[in-house]
């Protein structure tokens, strides 16, 4: 049996139902397909933001680490600078302390000197120390027989003119031995020695010079302290008159200034063991007064006495003294009348009215064969009695 043909209305209703069902299905399908895309977008955005935050954190950490590193480096640098500054401060304080100690010693020294001046120190114009040795008795006799006053005349110029003249000598390596006894006997006869607490020796002249100034300043309150060798001829009147021209000036270092070669070769006379301190081989010494005769003012002699323990001594005593003067505010006076030659040089100058303060032979670092020639030099170059008689020293 055949089924009945569907009516037209039924077909239309069925079509509409199918269309609606299809539309509904497609709508759900499309809706479901778009949701994950939206979620992906949100997730990507979230992850990106998280990564940016992480990046910011890392950058912050990096900057923090760099900042800390810079701070550490800066702190190390500041600490280093602080240490350096502290070292400089300590060095300055050490220098100031040393200066203060020296000042205290100097103040005590001057206080003691002032007290002694009132009790026993004699105020004089110049102390003239004649450097001599145990073996030089004949030289001393030649000096006594010519330009050096003796006996009552020695006492008179000391009292009236303020001029003290003494032979300067230390002691032998054997205290109380034959050499010391010989000097004791000679001094007992002439009373013209200044004894030092020093063991005599040619290579100890720098020490002897230092001790001479120290001893002389402790015994006499003088305006000038002179050192002269026992083979040099001196005109006392001309010497003290020359010194008097500089009496009002502070820190005077006077003599014939020279600059000789630094001798590095061993075995030669005047060899300088510390030659390397003066630069390259062939260099010369700094300018200093030749050792035959020179003078320094009271303040410089006092400086040597006060600081004697730290004054470096070179092989040659005149170089040592020059080195002590070099670092101070000192007036170097190049006085050529203190280094005239022996006759005919000093004789011609005397005849021309330019009497020499001292005469010697450069070639011998003193008068050649002075024992034999001192009297001859004195006859030709002596100043006479007038210059010394006319000299006046006011206390």
From Swiss-Prot:
The record's section on Gene3D superfamilies has: 3.90.550.50
| Enzyme Commission number, as recorded | 2.4.1.-
Q: Which domain of life is it from?
A: Eukaryota
| Keyword terms, alphabetized | Glycoprotein, Glycosyltransferase, Golgi apparatus, Manganese, Membrane, Signal-anchor, Transferase, Transmembrane, Transmembrane helix
GO MF terms here are: hexosyltransferase activity
Query: Where does the chain cross the membrane?
Result: 5-27
Report the coiled-coil segments: none
Q: Name one GO cellular component term.
A: Golgi membrane
Which coenzyme or cofactor does it need? Mn(2+)
Q: Where is the protein localized?
A: Golgi apparatus membrane
Pathway assignment reads: Protein modification; protein glycosylation
Q: Which InterPro entries match?
A: DUF4094, Glyco_trans_31
Sugar attachment sites are 117
* Any one GO biological process: protein glycosylation
Position of the signal peptide: none
Membrane topology, from the record: Single-pass type II membrane protein
Q: What does this protein do?
A: Beta-1,3-galactosyltransferase that transfers galactose from UDP-galactose to substrates with a terminal glycosyl residue.
Give the similarity note.
Belongs to the glycosyltransferase 31 family.
What's this protein's name?
Probable beta-1,3-galactosyltransferase 8
């Amino acid at each position: 049996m055949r089924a009945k043909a569907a009516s037209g209305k039924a077909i239309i209703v069925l079509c509409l139902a199918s269309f609606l069902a299809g539309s509904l299905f497609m709508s759900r399908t499309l809706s479901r397909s778009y949701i994950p895309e939206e979620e992906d977008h949100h997730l990507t955005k979230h992850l990106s933001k998280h990564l940016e935050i992480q990046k910011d954190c890392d950058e912050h950490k990096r900057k923090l680490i760099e900042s800390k590193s810079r701070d550490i480096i800066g702190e190390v640098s500041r600490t280093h600078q602080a240490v350096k500054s502290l070292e400089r401060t300590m060095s300055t304080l050490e220098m100031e302390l040393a200066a203060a100690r020296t000042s205290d010693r100097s103040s005590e020294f001057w206080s003691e000197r002032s007290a002694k001046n009132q009790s026993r120190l004699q105020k004089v114009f110049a102390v003239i120390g004649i450097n001599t040795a145990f073996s030089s008795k004949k030289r001393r006799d030649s000096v006594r027989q010519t330009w050096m006053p003796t006996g009552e005349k020695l006492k008179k110029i000391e009292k009236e003119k303020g001029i003290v003249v003494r032979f300067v000598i230390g002691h032998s390596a054997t205290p109380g031995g034959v050499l010391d006894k010989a000097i004791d006997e000679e001094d007992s006869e002439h009373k013209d020695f200044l004894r030092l607490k020093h063991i005599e020796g040619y290579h100890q002249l720098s020490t002897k010079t230092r001790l001479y100034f120290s001893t002389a300043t402790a015994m006499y309150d003088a305006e000038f302290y002179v050192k002269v060798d026992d083979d040099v001829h001196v005109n006392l009147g001309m010497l003290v008159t020359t010194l008097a021209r500089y009496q009002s000036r502070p820190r005077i270092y006077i003599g014939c200034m020279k600059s000789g070669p630094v001798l590095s070769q061993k075995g030669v006379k005047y060899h300088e063991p510390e030659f390397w301190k003066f630069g390259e081989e062939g260099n010369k010494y700094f300018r200093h007064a030749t050792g035959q005769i020179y003078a320094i003012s009271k303040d410089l002699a006092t400086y040597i006495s006060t600081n004697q323990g730290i004054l470096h001594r070179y092989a040659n005593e005149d170089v040592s003294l020059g080195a002590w003067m070099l670092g101070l505010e000192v007036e170097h006076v190049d006085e050529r009348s203190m280094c005239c030659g022996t006759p005919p040089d000093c004789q011609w100058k005397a005849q021309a009215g330019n009497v020499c303060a001292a005469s010697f032979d450069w070639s011998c670092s003193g008068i050649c064969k002075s024992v034999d020639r001192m009297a001859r030099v004195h006859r030709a170059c002596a100043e006479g009695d007038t210059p010394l008689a006319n000299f006046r020293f006011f206390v």
